[in-house]
């Protein structure tokens, strides 16, 4: 049995939007288009922002006429913008040429570890979620160092729905899902969490980031009892105080 599927049975990457995508995710939906790249890999070639569909479709692309012919779906995405780069410098665009690897379990293992261990929010998660640090999954892939040249929009499976559909996410989304989850599991309401994320980043975050953070926040907030959220927050505060005390003692030596 899958421990995450059991722990977060009502809403998790294993039950897309808790079985109610209209309430949890934008009603318009989004589909992502990919072509075969061999050995369980698929290359992102575009998508449709207005087709009321969140599937990842495999098909063929007529580059001359820029026409995509759909064949079948390999699953769905965690967020409406998982493979859509809303805040690219040259303007919003699909993460074309990014690879979705159905055999890559790194994102699944990363989320599984976070959700089972729940690191203290302040002196552990916030300290190590900065760019290039171990919780910055998009560039570290779950390691303790930044991996040079790694694609932040590489895709991978993170679970299945209650109907058996595979759920995929991008590496960038996985890191932001984690941020939202940590806030939610510590009992932080969404609006204060949203403001805290913007403050932490030094400005208003893009919609791609916000969508993933909200998805993660729902996982943590709605699947954790009030008592457990209080305990998680107290543990986070206690850990931060202890870290501060140790730092003060070391400076005095």
Annotate each predicted stretch with a short phrase.
Residues 29, 183, 187-188, 242-249:
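Sec-exported extracytoplasmic/periplasmic mature domains
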Residues 91, 102, 193-253:
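Active-site or metal-binding loop neighborhoods of secreted/extracellular toxin and effector enzymes
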Residues 76-208:
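Hydrophobic alpha-helical bundle signature of multipass membrane enzymes
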Residues 1-73, 79-86:
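Short turn/helix-capping motifs enriched in Asx and small/polar residues
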